[in-house]
Amino acid sequence: MSPSFKSTAILGAVALAARVRAHGYVSGIVVDGAYHGGYIVDKYPYMPNPPDVVGWSTTATDLGFVAPDAFGDPDIICHRDGAPGAIHAKVNAGATIELQWNTWPESHHGPVIDYLANCNGDCSSVDKTSLKFFKISEAGLNDGSNAPGQWASDDLIANNNSWTVTIPKSIAPGNYVLRHEIIALHSAGNQNGAQNYPQCFNLEITSNGSDNPEGVLGTELYKADDPGILFNIYQPMDSYPIPGPALYTGGSSPSPNPPTSTQSPVPQPTQSPPSGSNPGNGNGDDDNDNGNETPSPSLPVEIPDDLTSRELLLVAQEIIARLLELQNQLVVSN
């Protein structure tokens, strides 16, 4: 390993540690041109009276993930301690929904998957453990010829951190939970290394359809040893087995949207947490990490001294992922 490679890797690792909390969340959704707010997890938990939104609340203020060893836990359903949103977004079957992430780190390559579950009543009071999800959209590996590959998550980033999903025309009308998820695979070559980021939203769907797909309980969607969960992206890949149940016949595997230069307004936090709280501002990195450029942080770089043990683990995983990518770049260049 050359000295320049070593120094680049070390500086990149330090920069990652300094920005360990940079993962994103869905700040809102757009339906027929109307914006509906999501749960702003780095703001609303610290407000005495947060607004009613369609997005489910969560206690994942560190913007962390659900690991494979928690796939049987209710946290996998709609993220950590997920609780239903208070209101519903109205949408016609056959229409598209744009989900707007506030950010997503380029190093966190992986699939984007969408599910629906019929609440059989008001979603604002539904028991999440009773929800049965059917997959309506999935997208995974686009090109695996050069590790770590081009993924659906890269399409999301290229489209201004947004993703579009179509509500199947054939499903019956009713209130549904939309479960949108990115699975980050940068550490998935190791047991318990995949990172699931589920986000949930309440929908009121109007439809002339009649299908009521059976679905799968959220705690049964994945297993820790599924081929698409335990998966090494740091090697040439011919294909990728997208995890979860089979795609609903009325669903789709979307083609990526072309990148756009504009997007609907995304609400930004305007209030800092109370003194003494430690919400963090993400767990990932925001470097250009597409295999063409390497990190070039300015010095000195301070590593936060208030990281939790979970965040320290994330730092280690991020460092390993970055080193593997840099090593792959060196091999390719030689």
Swiss-Prot record:
Binding site for O2: 186, 195
Keyword Iron-sulfur: no
Name assigned to this protein: AA9 family lytic polysaccharide monooxygenase A
Any one cellular-component term (Gene Ontology): extracellular region
A Pfam short name: AA9
EC number in record: 1.14.99.56
Superkingdom of origin: Eukaryota
Chain spans, region Disordered: 244-304
Protein role: Lytic polysaccharide monooxygenase (LPMO) that depolymerizes crystalline and amorphous polysaccharides via the oxidation of scissile alpha- or beta-(1-4)-glycosidic bonds, yielding C1 or C4 oxidation products. Catalysis by LPMOs requires the reduction of the active-site copper from Cu(II) to Cu(I) by a reducing agent and H(2)O(2) or O(2) as a cosubstrate. Active on hemicelluloses, including xylan, glucomannan, and xyloglucan. Shows clear activity on cellooligosaccharides, generating C4 oxidation products.
Keyword tags: Carbohydrate metabolism, Cellulose degradation, Copper, Disulfide bond, Glycoprotein, Metal-binding, Monooxygenase, Oxidoreductase, Polysaccharide degradation, Secreted, Signal
GO molecular function term, any single one: monooxygenase activity
Necessary cofactors: Cu(2+)
Broad enzyme group: oxidoreductase
Residues carrying sugar: 160, 208
UniProt-listed PANTHER family: ENDO-BETA-1,4-GLUCANASE D, PUTATIVE (AFU_ORTHOLOGUE AFUA_1G12560)-RELATED
Catalysed transformations (reactions): [(1->4)-beta-D-glucosyl]n+m + reduced acceptor + O2 = 4-dehydro-beta-D-glucosyl-[(1->4)-beta-D-glucosyl]n-1 + [(1->4)-beta-D-glucosyl]m + acceptor + H2O
Biotechnology remark: Lignocellulose is the most abundant polymeric composite on Earth and is a recalcitrant but promising renewable substrate for industrial biotechnology applications. Together with cellobiose dehydrogenases (CDHs) an enzymatic system capable of oxidative cellulose cleavage is formed, which increases the efficiency of cellulases and put LPMOs at focus of biofuel research.
Claim: Transit peptide is one of the keywords in the record: no
Binding sites annotated in the UniProt record for Cu(2+): 23, 108, 197
Signal peptide: 1-22
Annotated organism of origin: Malbranchea cinnamomea (Thermophilic fungus)
